[in-house]
Structure formats: C-alpha cells, structure tokens
C-alpha cells in the first residue's frame, strides 16, 4: 500500500491539470473494472458492474487535484507574483518548496510584512531577471507544493498532496480487491475539488447514483492545542 501511495503522490497535478495522476490511476485500476471513461471536465470514472439486474448504483469519489499557486506576474528581477488556487494559508506557505508541471522548482517567499497576505507572496525560481524567468515559466502557469513525501516513524507518511491522494490510493486498492458485488460501483476520481467541488458535481449529475460517498481528509483533534473534532490519526 505504501508503494501505491507514493506512486499516486508523485505527479504534479494542480486543480485543472489532473491528467498526470489520472494516467497513473487508470493504469492501476484498468484490469479490475468493467469500464473507464474520462469526461469532458477530466474526471476519471471507473465502473464495476453489479451482479444483480438493475442493481443499486453506489458512487465513491476521491479528488485528484492539489492546491497550488497560479503565476499572475513576473517582476523585472525575475520573481513570480502568484495567487492561490484553492485554500492556501499565506503564513504557512513561507519557504515552501514548489514544483511546476514542466519541472521548474521554486521557493515561496514574502515581502517584509507584519501580517503576511497572499499579495505579499512571490516565488523565487532562481531567475536572473524577467527575461530569464520567461524562458522557464509563463503567466498563467500553476505550481504546487513539491512532493516531499517521507515516512514518519513506522507506519505514517507525510506529504503535501495527501489531500486527497491518500483517498485516491484507498479507492484504487478497494477496486483492486473488492471482488464481485451486488451493487454497481462507480468510482470517480474527480477534478477541481479544491476550487469548488466541480468535478464531483458534474459526475454526480451524469451518473445519477442511488448513493454517494465522498472520501477525503479532514481536520484532527489529537495534536497539542486541539480538542475538536474527536478524531485521532490511526483510529479510523
């Protein structure tokens, strides 16, 4: 399971550019489902037919996209001005390593400010000036927190893309191991969740399941200073 998780975590796939991770998932699940399609929005929809005629349809959904930044401008010194794609905390972004789909790497830094806001952030990609930066990145390009995946202790893993690639890996493994079911299983690996749950909404209307379950990460209550919700890592 750990190797599968690492494989799914690796692709750079911000909201709207999920194709790299969709390709990995398609390869993993193809032998275990009856049909696979990619809809117009980019959702990867995998169907495992039920054994009963007119069987109940159950949709299981996990999103493939990752929060990130979109380049909004390039300074004369070569620094990239950015804004958020999805929910990002400016203060938690400082000094974070980011990756662009074309392989360019950068670091998020900020203007000197008492209260860091998104408008204060920029990305340093090591460019000498604006012209140099434009050979590597263009306005409108998107980057994500780099896949710095590593193990914590014996059985825990940390990575910026665990939301929601952990659920993608779980759904993949479910399809690989579930066997025959009375119900028809519709597994949706959805796009653009971080910018408004767009993919899951489209897939839900298109497939009209009888029941739906979203698989995602959530807040926690087992670290210093937190009490709610009553959720602990490793306890289900």
Predicted regions and their residues:
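N-terminal hydrophobic/helix-forming segments and targeting peptides
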Residues: 1-236
């Amino acid at each position: 399971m750990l190797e599968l998780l690492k494989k799914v975590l690796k692709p750079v796939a911000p909201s709207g550019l999920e194709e790299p991770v969709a390709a990995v998932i398609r390869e993993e699940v193809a032998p275990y489902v009856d049909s696979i399609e990619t809809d117009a929005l980019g959702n990867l929809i995998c169907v495992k037919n039920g054994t009963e005629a007119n069987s109940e349809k159950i949709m299981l959904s996990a999103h493939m996209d990752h929060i990130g930044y979109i380049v909004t401008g390039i300074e004369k010194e070569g620094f990239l001005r950015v804004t958020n794609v999805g929910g990002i905390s400016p203060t938690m972004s400082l000094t974070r390593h980011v990756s662009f789909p074309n392989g360019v790497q950068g670091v998020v830094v900020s203007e000197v400010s008492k209260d860091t806001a998104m408008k204060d952030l920029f990305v340093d990609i090591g460019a000498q000036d604006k012209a140099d930066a434009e050979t590597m990145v263009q306005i409108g390009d998107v980057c994500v927190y780099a896949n710095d995946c590593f193990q914590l202790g014996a059985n825990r893993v940390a990575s910026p893309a665990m939301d929601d690639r952990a659920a993608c890996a779980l759904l993949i493994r479910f399809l690989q191991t579930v066997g025959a079911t009375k119900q028809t299983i519709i597994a949706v690996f959805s796009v653009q969740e971080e910018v408004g749950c767009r993919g899951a909404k489209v897939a839900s209307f298109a497939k009209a399941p009888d029941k739906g379950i979203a698989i995602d990460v959530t807040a926690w209550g087992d670290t210093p200073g937190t009490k709610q919700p009553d959720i602990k890592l490793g306890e289900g």
